[in-house]
Amino acid sequence: MKKIKNMISFVDNVLVKFRRVFINILTVLFLMLITLSFFYVMGSLFESDKVETEDQVLYLEPNGVILDKAITRNEPFEEFEIFGNSTNQIELESFLKVIKNAGADDDLKAIYVNVDDLSAYYTSALKIADALYEARENGKEIIAFTSGLGTTGYLMASQATEIILEKDSYESVLPFGFSRVRQYQKDFFENIKVDMNVYAAGDFKSGPEGYTRNDMSETDKLAWLEFVTPVWEKYKSKMEAGRGFESGKIQYVGDNYHLLSAENGGNDNETALAIGLVDKLMSKQELRNYMIEKYGSKEEYERPEGISGREYLSTLKDRHVSNKKKRVQEKNKIAIIHVEGEIVTGNIGFNTAGSRDIVKNINKARDDENVKGIVLRVNSPGGDVYASSMITNALEEFQSTGRPVITSMGDIAASGGVWVTTTSEEIWAEETTLTGSIGVYSIIPDFSPLENWVGMSYDGVSMTKAGDVYDLRRGMSEELNNQFRENTENIYKDFVTKVANNRDMDFSEVLKFAGGRIWRGDTAFELGLVDKLGSLEDAIDSMVTKLELEEYKAFSYNNEIEFEDYLNSLTKDILPVQIQGLLNKISGLNRMFLSEKDRFVVAYCFDCGFRNFE
């Protein structure tokens, strides 16, 4: 008995000491955080607000994702990155503003740009490429340095005066165009004895094909090729113009790269130099010396004196580069409501458009009598039907006050991203916007064959027949199967009806370009799916004209993410890419199968993803 007491006492002492050590460690970490916060705040208070631009080189080294509206963190120390810049967000408008102003700024010696770590969809990338080309045409020297670029990265870098490739890099420059390869799992689910019950409305709604096929359908190939081929032509044209190539060279490089590489001993960097994709090969140290010799002094600087994009942005006062009218009248406000990312219920997060927060923003605009109209900015592949309906309901309530809503489509406004536009008086899209995908589907997995195979079963009693036939644990009943099918078809009809009413078309007319098929913005304009082609700025100007305003202010509500969600995103970002992909799939399945209420149907565009050798 004494030995047992001694053992318990020993364990208790160990636990007490461990607890003390753990608490001490937490205390030290907390004090370090407070100290860092203090020095950061004091540094911010005493640092000079004056940013010198004369005889400077502007260094643009964006690291992150291009989007319309950045997400801020709802936390006390939101300026601190815990695991580094894993969730960097670059607002397109601000980035373009820096490039356009820098191109016309005679004080700046040159622009240095490195887009290796910049991720942008093609409409945004084309805008950035155009801005760089315009700056170069204005006489500004642009030096692009890279350790390796794919198609979209090279599109932007090719607008520079000079492209320098890191000679020791193993990535090189490979503008091979767009490629779309999906994983197909039909046989996999059959082999593990899981029945994937798929209900799709729309012949071109290819999202669930990964569960029902072992290869890409002809309709999927057709829709994607018709969408992306003109985009690829536009990319090639701009790359060739930027580099001074004859027409057809980029296509030739992509089709014959294996031969071109063989001519240069299989060395990708030497191949890029030989065929003119880049101008020079340099190490980073050689680049530093080159920049000092070209733009700097002989002093021991790490690089010539320069300023960052963030510093340069702080010197620019106006929010919009191309203001045609003043936006200073607080009594005439235009609210820009962003729907960015996958549409889900709940709060806004990284790459998710949470309907709860979006509805809150719409209601803020509704309750503010100084807000004269809403410009809905959509950059979304769609998502949950219920969440999309929550957004349109809030917009309709805003419109019931007699104030208008105009939509501006960004890179993507597909499926549920179209659904949320169906109350708008006017819809704008970019030429290369990916839109359409008017269709819905639901996926219900049935694990009963697997459970039976391993020796598991469910049995019990129920007070009603429905209690038995609607219990998925017992397998997919005929009654439940029919209901899911009818539910999907009914939501599809509702979707088409909403579009038809908004576009002032017959139901049958909309069916011709619905069916889940994706369209480019210019084709959508020809079909009548959108009213006009243009940018967010054009949509705002259209709202100003509609309201007959002389002075106004266009503004956006902040998109805040809860600190817990931010920590979750950081934790996921440090995981290997393969694990991240698996978690995304599990998360998607969770939203489909374990969502609130009985919402099994989604309006999402799985077709909106592609690989461009980034």
Predicted regions and their residues:
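N-terminal Lys/Arg-rich, disordered targeting/topogenic segments
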Residues: M1-F22
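Intrinsic disorder and flexible/low-complexity segments
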Residues: K2, K317-N370, N487, N558-E614
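Tryptophan-centric aromatic hotspots in well-structured domains and transmembrane helices
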Residues: D12, W419, W519-R520
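Hydrophobic membrane-insertion alpha-helices, especially the h-region
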Residues: I23-V41
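Aromatic-capped interface at the extracytoplasmic side
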Residues: Y40-E54
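Cleft-lining beta-strand/loop regions that shape enzyme active-site pockets
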Residues: V51, Q56-R182, K324-L450
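Charged, glycine-interspersed solvent-exposed loop segments at helix/strand-loop junctions
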Residues: K186-I292, S448, N452-L527, D531-L533, ...
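C-terminal long alpha-helix characteristic of the crotonase
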Residues: A241-G242, L260-S261, D279-E330, Y441, ...
